[in-house]
A protein has these predicted regions:
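Terminal helix/beta-alpha structural elements that buttress the NAD(P)+-binding lobe
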Residues: 1-159
Length: 162
């Protein structure tokens, strides 16, 4: 599997390469789709995982190969506008909008999925970037960091220093 990364700023590119991306582009670059097509020799990618939503949706669709699959699993920039079926038909594209909680149908499935994720952490298949702790009293700063997409790591509120 070859992965092309998408980030919100130049500062995050190096981390994606350390985590195995063969190439990484800034998501709001107006030439994003063209760069993806260039890297794939004009084919496009088979799958796009898009957590941003409205701001990246069109470039995500444009980056797909024929019979490609777009998985929109978040909409941090706002909801995606309706898509015409004829747009999908141009390249026989598929789209899904999974909701994580729908996959937790029963306790057994939940435990199995959780175990596989924890195993991926143990085996360093999933690598954890830096953690950014904020005191609870600084929750507004944590939200600003999260909303600005400049955190670059996991943000959490600490109750220890109250």
């Amino acid at each position: 599997v070859k992965v092309i990364g998408s980030v919100g700023s130049q500062e995050k590119i190096e981390e994606t390469k350390l985590n195995g991306c063969i190439e990484t582009f800034i998501s709001n670059d107006e030439k994003f789709s063209k760069k993806v097509l260039d890297v794939t020799n004009g084919k496009g990618v088979d799958i796009v995982f898009d957590s941003v939503g409205n701001d990246t949706f069109e470039s995500s669709l444009s980056s797909l190969a024929h019979c490609g699959y777009l998985i929109n699993f978040g909409q941090s920039s706002g909801p995606v506008q309706p898509v015409l079926m004829s747009t999908l038909a141009e390249k026989s594209l598929s789209i899904s909008r999974p909701i994580l909680f729908h996959y937790f149908g029963n306790r057994k499935n939940y435990e199995k999925m959780a175990a596989s994720v924890f195993k991926a952490f143990e085996d360093e298949i999933i690598k954890v970037s830096e953690f950014l702790p904020f005191d609870l009293k600084d929750a507004s700063n944590a939200h600003e960091t999260l909303e600005s997409r400049k955190g670059g790591g996991s943000i959490y509120l600490s109750l220890i220093h109250i």
